[in-house]
């Protein structure tokens, strides 16, 4: 009979962890939070304002689970609390220990991946509950209740006949504001018309290339021409159908190093909605295929890097191993980047042996390829830059173009190759090239792009609003409440209802509904997590 009880949050982890630990342990799940914030007390906020403590009650849906956990705890000599390694997980751990009354025989264990090695290491290196993390979660929860209740109360008074119950929250209001602000930018955008001239030239068996005008008399980026000047220039350029090569420069450059995924970048790069990506990543984590996905770190453990380097050397050769893996977060934060748990688990192998569906296979492949590419040598390209002269009877016009070729393919072996010409023409300075035709291109500047799920989450992350654990739910909530809608091209558009809600919020709470305030709150929550700030002071 088991004499040790290990408690996790998600029931999906139970079977895998039980398999690793054997009969000595009983693995059970709390199925998330077992307590919830009540609606008792002053203003129905569930807060004891005398000491700024939450009034917590048992979640009625968890009564049976709590009884089962209590019964299991009575028969166990040791309780291992293995909830997730973040603020929410720490709060759940604290509530479990207090509710089960096992303060004298519990151990807190944390792991970033569900593998036998990681679980055993966590068990052999137990911790205490981090009270600072618990305080940060408590502060975040109370803040969200105070602000959310008051904002929602205002909405319900100000907006009648709404399509959904008007409500608002600290972070979701900023997400709505970003979408509405971007829509205003687009609506007020005045396009600027401009023109370009390109020369079409045949180069042996190569595709047709275009040589862009580079006369500095025209504008800042050397290629735009105002519509008022284009006619005269275009007519003059066409009088000479030869371009003379006046300069050739050859440069070598390394491509940028790939940085491993943190959660917001995974959302941005994936082709699915944030909710689908979150669900898939969580499933991959629970099945032991990837590390903890709700992370804002780009750090990879040294032990994994060494294993990956060995794998890369064996599969591709020593020259494909990065000499120095730079660019990752250097601080020893609690989490790593999102990475595979085992570099040997290739996407094809994982798909077959773990019966991954199409979406999970896609997300795992993204994560696997991104990780291995981050530890591979960067590609090197050689670029040939050509300056060309069109000399007419009245003026001189300069054109430019460039060709690149790979000298070393590096991580492109995994990520795929960029489009490049099959060969670089053998031009010399002084050569004349025949122009088939000059092409006038009339264009106009474009407004900023609307957000989609991924780019909105990336923006929230960039301005330090919200946390990895809440990004997907934040976007989901503003959709469900009909504040924004997703169009066929996956872009987010504010509804008239959403615009009205934001207007009322800003008029009622101008200091709260702004990016700077919300980012400052996140900064203080981090300081509380680190024990550097008194949580009651913020509240």
Task: Give a label for each model feature.
Residues 1-147, 224, 275, 436:
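Intrinsically disordered, low-complexity regulatory segments
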Residues 140-152, 199-201, 252-261, 278-290, ...:
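Core structural elements
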Residues 16-20, 68, 91-99, 118-122, ...:
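Alpha-helical scaffold elements adjacent to nucleotide-binding pockets in ATP/GTP-utilizing enzyme cores
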């Amino acid at each position: 009979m088991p004499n040790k009880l290990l408690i996790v949050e998600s029931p999906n982890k139970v079977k895998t962890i039980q398999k690793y630990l054997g009969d000595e342990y009983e693995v059970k799940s709390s199925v998330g939070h077992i307590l919830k914030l009540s609606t008792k007390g002053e203003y129905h906020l569930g807060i004891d304002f005398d000491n700024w403590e939450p009034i917590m009650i048992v979640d009625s849906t968890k009564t049976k689970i709590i009884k089962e956990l209590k019964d299991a705890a009575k028969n166990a000599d040791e309780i291992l609390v293995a909830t997730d390694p973040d603020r929410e997980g720490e709060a759940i751990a604290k509530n479990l220990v207090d509710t089960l009354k096992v303060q004298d025989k519990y151990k807190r264990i944390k792991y970033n991946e569900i593998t036998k090695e990681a679980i055993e290491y966590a068990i052999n290196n137990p911790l205490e509950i981090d009270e600072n993390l618990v305080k940060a979660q408590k502060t975040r929860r109370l803040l969200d209740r105070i602000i959310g209740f008051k904002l929602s109360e205002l909405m319900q008074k100000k907006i009648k006949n709404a399509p959904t119950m008007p409500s608002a929250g600290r972070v979701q209001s900023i997400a709505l504001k970003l979408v509405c602000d971007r829509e205003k930018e687009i609506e007020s955008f005045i396009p600027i018309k401009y023109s370009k001239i390109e020369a079409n030239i045949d180069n042996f068996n190569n595709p047709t290339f275009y040589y862009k005008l580079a006369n500095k008399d025209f504008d800042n980026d050397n290629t735009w021409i105002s519509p008022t000047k284009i006619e005269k220039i275009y007519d003059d350029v066409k009088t000479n159908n030869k371009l003379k090569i006046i300069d050739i420069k050859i440069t070598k450059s390394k491509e940028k190093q790939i940085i491993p995924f943190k959660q917001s970048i995974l959302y941005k790069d994936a082709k699915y909605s944030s909710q689908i990506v979150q669900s898939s990543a969580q499933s991959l984590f629970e099945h032991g295929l990837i590390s903890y996905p709700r992370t804002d770190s780009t750090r990879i453990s040294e032990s994994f890097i060494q294993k990956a380097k060995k794998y890369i050397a064996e599969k591709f050769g020593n020259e494909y191993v990065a000499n120095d893996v730079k660019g990752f977060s250097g601080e020893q934060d609690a989490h790593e980047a999102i990475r595979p748990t085992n570099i040997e688990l290739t996407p094809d192998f994982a798909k077959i042996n773990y019966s991954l569906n199409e979406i999970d296979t896609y997300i795992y492949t993204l994560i696997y390829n991104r990780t291995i590419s981050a530890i591979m040598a960067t590609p090197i390209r050689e670029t040939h830059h050509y300056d060309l002269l069109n000399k007419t009877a009245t003026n001189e016009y300069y054109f430019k173009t460039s060709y690149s070729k790979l000298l070393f393919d590096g991580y492109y072996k995994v990520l795929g190759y960029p489009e490049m010409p099959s060969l670089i023409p053998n031009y010399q300075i002084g050569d004349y090239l025949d122009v088939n035709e000059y092409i006038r291109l009339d264009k106009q500047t474009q407004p900023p792009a609307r957000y989609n799920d991924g780019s909105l989450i990336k923006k929230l992350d960039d301005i330090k609003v919200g946390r990895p654990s809440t990004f997907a739910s934040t976007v989901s909530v503003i959709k469900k409440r009909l504040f924004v809608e997703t169009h066929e091209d996956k872009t987010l558009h504010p509804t008239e209802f959403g615009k009205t809600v934001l207007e009322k919020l800003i008029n009622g709470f101008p200091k709260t509904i702004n990016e700077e305030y919300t980012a400052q709150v996140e900064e203080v929550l981090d300081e509380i997590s680190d024990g550097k700030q008194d949580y009651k002071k913020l509240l």
